[in-house]
């Protein structure tokens, strides 16, 4: 899902583009039938179904070419996309999808239930990044626990709590296709229905026998069709799917290219080389403000639900002490950053979940208080140990606010240094726990409270068969219990209460600090 700022040219085509990008963009119309879209990160693969790791840029391109069985509506509820009807059995374990009529893939093949079954067979055969969402990770008592290795950012090595050995248990017991228009998923327990729907959103349905070609020549059922890819320039050419089942796009051609440098993107927008720049983009907020009203450029804003955050390695000294993490929470003036650096293109975050979520709970609030921060550092016995703050290189906006955060932390007596790394290196180090503080943005995933389990359950600490998402390596037995009860509850009111208790504990111990909700513009 897209999130972020939209800078646009004043014309109705913006609305057409937004219908496919689901959020923000920059648009300028030239004398051509092609619209050029810029992304700030390179897309490394088109096959997002079976890929081993997440690729945000590739997911954005994928959203133009593919459909899923399920999508989110404006209220973050799950509704059908390629499914026109979703029915649940009385026992809650059988979910039946009645498929849309008259859907065709880009190769002309009619869409049937066999394609859904084939897609999931390929997904589970690949054991890729997305397949893990359809499994529970549970303790494996047959294997001894493993202690993390000693690293630069985890210098206490053997003193760190042992990582429990785990195994995967499938959510889905069967997928049946009784006829061409019906797919029946059976889950192992009733509470997994909502997890199934949440996970189906990210699964692009592909035609039978097409898996081998998806990497180089993707074929889906979405509004745009793949034409060509220039790997040297990181440019993909798309054309309108004139037989698109949900209404043909009015834009004949779409070009998606990577522009990683902020100045280059600004120049291209002003010169007309780029029409749309969906966020996260690499344009700093001050540039966006200056571009608003410049020529035909305009910035429109509405509330966003994505979350910018700091994640702390809760197993790396001195951040293994909750008081150090709490001190950081009080040291950062988020309202000032939002007002003066982001020019109110965001709202300070009070939770990892957006306020629009049915499970939202504010938890412990960290209002700016330098005196409280210094007191906590004193109570923690902090002696000036160095702390490394890492983030991906190449994004001018991130660089601006990261330096402000570094300065704020050093002002209260912390010894923080910045290290910028290539994005893939950062991802690898996060998975291995080789960091202390990292800043990033979750796009879309935080709209469902199941996200709390992904971020804070000890069963989600990366390692072994687990690739996501408890990057803080946070462990709390009570949180594990509460969040599992919440995820498995079929009573929304009870689940809301349990998720609230979970966030109360987590926000107090603070393995992750919500910063702000970036605006969609």
Language-model features: locations:
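Surface-exposed binding/hinge segments that line
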Residues: 98, 133-207
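Ligand/substrate-recognition segments at binding pockets and active sites
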Residues: 231, 378-445, 492
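Aromatic- and charge-enriched surface segment that lines or borders ligand/interaction sites
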Residues: 84-132, 184, 268, 318
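Extracytoplasmic/peripheral linker and loop segments enriched in polar/acidic and small residues
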Residues: 28, 411, 415-426, 431, ...
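Append "and occasionally in soluble cytosolic enzymes with long acidic Gly/Pro-rich linkers
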Residues: 239, 319-407, 411-412, 473-482, ...
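Aromatic-rich, solvent-exposed beta-strand/loop patch
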Residues: 106, 186-203, 218-264, 285-307
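A structural "hinge/loop" feature
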Residues: 41-60, 82-84, 109, 131-134, ...
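N-terminal lobe/hinge region of extracytoplasmic solute-binding protein
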Residues: 39-90, 121, 217-221
């Amino acid at each position: 899902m897209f999130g972020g700022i939209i800078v646009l040219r004043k014309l109705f085509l913006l609305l057409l583009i937004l219908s496919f990008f689901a959020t923000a963009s920059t648009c300028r119309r030239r004398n051509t039938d092609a619209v050029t879209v810029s992304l700030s990160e390179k897309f490394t693969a088109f096959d997002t179904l079976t890929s081993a790791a997440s690729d945000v840029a590739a997911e954005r391109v994928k959203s133009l070419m593919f459909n899923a069985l399920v999508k989110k509506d404006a209220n973050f509820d799950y509704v059908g996309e390629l499914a026109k009807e979703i029915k649940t059995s009385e026992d809650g374990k059988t979910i039946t999808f009645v498929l849309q009529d008259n859907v065709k893939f880009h190769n002309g093949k009619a869409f049937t239930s066999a394609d859904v079954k084939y897609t999931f067979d390929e997904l589970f055969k690949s054991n890729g990044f997305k397949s893990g969402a359809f499994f529970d990770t549970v303790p494996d008592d047959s294997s001894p626990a493993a202690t993390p290795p000693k690293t630069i950012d985890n210098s206490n090595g053997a003193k760190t709590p042992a990582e429990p050995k785990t195994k995967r248990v499938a959510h889905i017991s069967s997928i049946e296709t009784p006829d061409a228009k019906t797919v029946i998923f059976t889950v192992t327990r009733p509470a997994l229905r909502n997890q199934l729907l949440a996970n189906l959103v990210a699964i692009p349905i592909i035609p039978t026998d097409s898996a081998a070609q998806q990497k180089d020549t993707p074929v889906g059922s979405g509004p745009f069709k793949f034409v060509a890819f220039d790997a040297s320039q990181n440019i993909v050419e798309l054309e309108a799917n004139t037989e698109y089942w949900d209404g043909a796009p009015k834009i004949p051609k779409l070009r998606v290219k990577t522009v990683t440098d902020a100045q280059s993107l600004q120049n291209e927008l002003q010169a007309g080389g780029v029409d749309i720049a969906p966020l996260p983009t690499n344009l700093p907020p001050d540039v966006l403000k200056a571009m608003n009203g410049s020529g035909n450029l305009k910035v429109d804003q509405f509330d966003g639900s994505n979350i910018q955050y700091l994640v702390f390695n809760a197993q790396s000294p001195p951040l293994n002490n909750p008081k150090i993490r709490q001190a950081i929470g009080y040291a950062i003036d988020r309202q000032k950053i939002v007002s003066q650096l982001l020019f109110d293109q965001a709202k300070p975050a009070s939770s990892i979940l957006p306020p629009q979520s049915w499970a939202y709970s504010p938890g412990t609030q960290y209002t700016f208080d330098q005196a409280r921060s210094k007191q906590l550092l004193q109570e923690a016995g902090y002696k000036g140990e160095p702390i490394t703050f890492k983030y991906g290189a190449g994004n001018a906006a991130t660089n601006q606010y990261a330096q402000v955060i570094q300065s704020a932390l050093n002002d209260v007596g912390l010894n923080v240094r910045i290290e910028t790394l290539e994005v893939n290196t950062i991802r690898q180090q996060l998975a291995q726990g080789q960091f202390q503080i990292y800043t990033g943005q979750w796009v879309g995933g935080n709209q469902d409270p199941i996200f709390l389990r992904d971020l804070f359950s000890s069963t989600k600490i990366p390692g072994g068969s687990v690739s996501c998402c408890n990057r803080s390596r946070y462990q709390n037995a009570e949180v594990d219990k509460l969040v599992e009860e919440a995820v498995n509850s079929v009573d929304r009111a009870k689940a809301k209460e349990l998720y609230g208790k979970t966030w109360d504990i987590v926000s107090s111990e603070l393995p992750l600090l919500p910063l702000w909700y970036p605006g969609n513009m």
